[in-house]
Amino acid sequence: MRDRWPVPRRAGAVIRTNLEAGRRPLETFEDYVFYCDLMVNDGRHTYDGADAFREIIQHYPGTILLLNLRDREAWITSRLRHGHGEFARREMAARGLSDEAALTEAWRTDWDARLSAVRAHMADRPGQLVEFDIDKDSPADLVAALPRYGLNPEDFHDIGNSRTRRLSPLMRRLKAEIAHRRPRFFGK
């Protein structure tokens, strides 16, 4: 989701607010087909809308959950680097953790618990859980798992993959400054 769309940039905040108010999780933007980037963190509170998968399935019983997988430790490393460390700092503050080691252990626990919970909850819903390993599976595998959407594997490419990108020292510094200083408006 992007700001130019008629949906708030942080869908996770909308999901959290809706559930707190007793509404359906995706109320106000139910016409969309795909939802992602459901994490909200302002340094005081952290909420991952992906944890609302039970409520989403309850209110939208035909939903297909796409569970993106990758090596857990690579995922943690990526999160630690996200926003030049700003995301990890906000997560530590919101969780009341004092060091990166405690945060990485919390993320390991979260990862294992979510995988187990999603798989258990979806066990009796064959065809509604699609697991996609971003390191091993191809776009063609994803397209094959979602035939009714008429997807084209050529439309999928890696956006946001910075593992192999090399920036000049000036660009690295500018990106870090922007990541640490940009205003964040997440509501409560």
Per-region residue spans from a language model:
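A structural signal for short, well-ordered beta-strand segments and their strand-loop junctions
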Residues: R2-D3, F34-D37, I64-L69, V130-D133, ...
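Short hydrophobic/aromatic-enriched beta-strand-loop microsegments
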Residues: M1-W5, R89, G150-H157
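N-terminal cationic-hydrophobic initiation segments that often serve targeting/anchoring roles
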Residues: L26, I56-Q58, R119-A123
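PAPS-dependent sulfotransferase catalytic core
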Residues: M1-Y32, L38, R165, M171-H180, ...
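PAPS-dependent sulfotransferase catalytic domain
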Residues: A50-T109, Q128, A140-A144
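PAPS-dependent sulfotransferases, especially Golgi type II membrane carbohydrate sulfotransferases
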Residues: S98-K188
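Glycine-rich phosphate-binding loop used to anchor ATP phosphates in small-molecule kinases
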Residues: T28-I57, N68
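Well-ordered, non-membrane alpha-helical segments in soluble/globular domains
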Residues: L19-G22, T46-R54, R108-S116
